[in-house]
């Protein structure tokens, strides 16, 4: 509803709970809010005394749309849904586009596998986490393997083993694949690992101590020594790890502000043990208070489907939380589970609140320093290349292949805060003459910018090509054909002897080359972006090339038909294991002579690397 006459408009508003949407002249939603009393809350925006942020917003508001809800809880849940849908510029917007990783234990298997997992929890078994990042998962996975020696391999690899793999040799697995441990003993390893995940280290130590004593009484000293080492490792770990007083799952949310920016840090406490922390830097309008940011952050974060249903029993905040009970009730209702929120600074959470706030301040400081550094470098590029407009986004393309084989193109994206890895793309090139870099470049640019024109992304301010004037001409022709305008086309070409620091720069529409000093910060960033595109392209190319060669290696061996090829792969559990095998080991496969084994060995090693 338009607000030409505010007094008349406000009288039409209901006095019950609901959600309101502020819209600008184009009908775009620029703010979403919730209210226990819609009339009273919306009326507050028409007072004379407003803060600068609200004044700036209200100057753009042309209409307000309201949605009535049955109760306050529904209002909070609907507000979070609308914020996610409309991404209003005056709301605190959480940018958290990645699901959280877990450790997954396939308890339904005879010999359960423990592995890294990310995604919807559809497979049967136990999930431990979530962890703040992949590094935390891998660190804990390595620890569990060291302590309890659970297998990590896939089912196909496991079922086709005839000898232990490297994990057994480095004492990270007990090799159930070849019967070195029976099902009962392996289940004990699994049970110990589960107790460890649940924070019941003392119970694990008691069990291991009992087994050690039994082994000693039976004079099985090697086994007793193994249990002794496990106990020592667990006790050492207990001293190193930070343990809370309780045994539950708690999220401690710290918040900090600096120069108008706001940052969060969440400490993840799982089964009484801190497993890591993760920082967040949402888009916050200038003038947003810590309390407002906290109120808008919490529902967005915990109602996101990326949480995968993993909600702690308690949330603790480092700052007072307005409408704490309202948010607590609404989240409990929306998530269909009991949830407590604590914002008082008292035992046993006081030290954790201080630690979370400290982590938030430190992360925000580093984030702003990096942001300022990249913003300055982008400004330096604009000045050094004499570009007409400021730069907020650069895309760089590179082509990688080996003599025309397995050609791959990469696209990396940099912005004011550095690399934007979620926008990186790789393209498998097909249908062009092998080794035709111009053809490959035309294909990747066409595919990329057709998608951008259709609204699948943001056009860059600058397009950077790893190449010279020839590549730049191809890019200009493609963008002209697609009628893409407003993008500055640049290229970086290798200098004499391909030495770093001697590169030449080109800008489309100018005849002269540009040479920047080796110590120029703009030049350094251009090199960094080019090198990142090259790294991303060559990694994708090597993976594609290796896959092709793996698929073709056995087909090239004379005398090996489909059945024998399958028998070899099944015997060794895969082509990589076959490549590691000696001639003697290959000759042990039924139906393979020593002569054929040598031919297989030679063919495998011909394609190594």
Curated annotation (Swiss-Prot):
UniProt xrefs under InterPro entries: GIY-YIG_endonuc (IPR000305), GIY-YIG_endonuc_sf (IPR035901), GIY-YIG_UvrC_Cho (IPR047296), Hlx-hairpin-Hlx_DNA-bd_motif (IPR003583), RuvA_2-like (IPR010994), UVR_dom (IPR001943), UVR_dom_sf (IPR036876), UvrABC_protein_C (IPR050066)
The keyword Coiled coil belongs to this UniProt entry's keyword annotation: no
Primary location group: cytoplasm
Record key words, sorted: Cytoplasm, DNA damage, DNA excision, DNA repair, Excision nuclease, SOS response
Gene Ontology CC: cytoplasm; excinuclease repair complex
A GO molecular-function annotation: excinuclease ABC activity
Residue ranges occupied by any GIY-YIG domain in the UniProt entry: 15-92
SUPFAM superfamilies: C-terminal UvrC-binding domain of UvrB (SSF46600), GIY-YIG endonuclease (SSF82771), RuvA domain 2-like (SSF47781)
Domain of life (superkingdom): Bacteria
Location of this chain's protein in the cell: Cytoplasm
Subunit structure: Interacts with UvrB in an incision complex.
Record-linked PANTHER family: UVRABC SYSTEM PROTEIN C, UVRC/OXIDOREDUCTASE
Name assigned to this protein: UvrABC system protein C
Organism: Coxiella burnetii (strain CbuK_Q154)
The encoding gene: uvrC
């Amino acid at each position: 509803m338009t607000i030409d006459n505010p007094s008349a408009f406000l009288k039409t508003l209901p006095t019950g709970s609901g959600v309101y949407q502020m819209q600008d002249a184009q009908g775009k939603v620029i703010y979403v809010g919730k209210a226990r009393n819609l009339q009273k809350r919306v009326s507050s925006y028409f007072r004379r005394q407003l803060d600068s942020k609200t004044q700036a917003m209200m100057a753009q508001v042309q209409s307000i749309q309201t949605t009535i809800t049955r109760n306050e809880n529904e209002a909070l849940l609907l507000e979070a849904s609308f914020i996610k849908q409309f991404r209003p510029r005056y709301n605190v917007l959480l940018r958290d586009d990645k699901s959280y990783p877990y450790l997954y234990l396939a308890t339904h298997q005879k010999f359960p596998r423990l592995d890294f997992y990310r995604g919807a929890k559809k497979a049967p078994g136990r999930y431990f986490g979530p962890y703040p990042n992949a590094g935390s998962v891998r660190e804990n996975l390595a620890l569990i393997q060291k302590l309890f020696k659970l297998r990590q391999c896939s089912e196909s690899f496991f079922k086709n083993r005839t000898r232990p793999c490297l994990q057994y040799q480095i004492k990270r697995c007990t090799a159930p694949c070849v019967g070195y441990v029976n099902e009962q003993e392996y289940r004990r390893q699994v049970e110990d690992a589960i107790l460890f995940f649940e924070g019941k280290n003392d119970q694990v130590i008691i069990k291991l101590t009992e087994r050690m004593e039994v082994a000693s009484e039976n004079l099985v000293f090697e086994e007793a020594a193994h249990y002794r080492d496990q106990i020592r490792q667990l006790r050492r770990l207990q001293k190193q790890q930070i343990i809370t007083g309780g045994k539950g799952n708690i999220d401690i949310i710290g918040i900090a502000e600096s120069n108008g920016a706001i940052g969060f840090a969440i400490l993840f406490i799982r089964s009484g043990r801190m497993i890591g922390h993760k920082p967040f830097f949402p888009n916050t309008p200038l003038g947003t208070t810590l309390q407002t940011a906290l109120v808008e952050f919490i529902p967005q974060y915990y109602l996101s489907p990326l949480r995968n249903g993993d909600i702690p029993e308690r949330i603790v905040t480092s700052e007072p939380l307005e409408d704490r009970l309202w948010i607590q009730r609404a989240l409990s209702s929306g998530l269909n589970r009991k949830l407590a929120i604590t914002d008082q600074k008292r035992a046993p959470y006081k030290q954790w609140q201080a630690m979370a706030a400290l982590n938030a301040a430190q992360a925000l400081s580093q984030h702003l320093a990096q942001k300022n550094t990249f913003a300055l470098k982008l400004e330096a590029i604009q000045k050094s290349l004499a570009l007409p407009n400021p730069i907020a986004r650069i895309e760089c393309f590179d082509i990688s292949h080996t003599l025309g084989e397995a050609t791959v193109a990469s696209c990396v994206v940099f912005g004011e805060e550095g690399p934007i890895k979620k926008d990186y793309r790789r393209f498998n090139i097909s249908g062009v003459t092998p080794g035709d870099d111009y053809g490959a470049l035309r294909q990747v640019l066409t595919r990329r910018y057709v998608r951008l024109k259709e609204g699948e992304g943001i056009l860059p301010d600058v397009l950077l090509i790893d190449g010279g004037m020839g590549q730049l001409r191809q890019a200009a022709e493609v963008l002209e054909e697609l009628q893409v305008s407003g993008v500055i086309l640049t290229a970086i070409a290798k200098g004499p002897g391909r030495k770093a620091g001697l590169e030449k720069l080109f800008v489309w529409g100018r005849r002269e080359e540009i040479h920047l000093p080796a110590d120029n910060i703009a030049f350094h960033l251009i090199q960094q972006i080019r090198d990142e595109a090259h790294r991303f392209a060559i990694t994708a190319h090597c993976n594609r090339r290796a896959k092709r060669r793996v698929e073709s290696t056995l087909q090239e061996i004379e005398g090996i038909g489909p059945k024998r090829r399958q028998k070899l792969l099944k015997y060794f559990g895969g082509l990589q294991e076959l490549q590691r095998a000696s001639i003697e080991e290959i000759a042990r496969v039924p139906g393979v002579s020593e002569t054929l084994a040598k031919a297989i060995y030679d063919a495998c090693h011909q394609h190594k690397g």
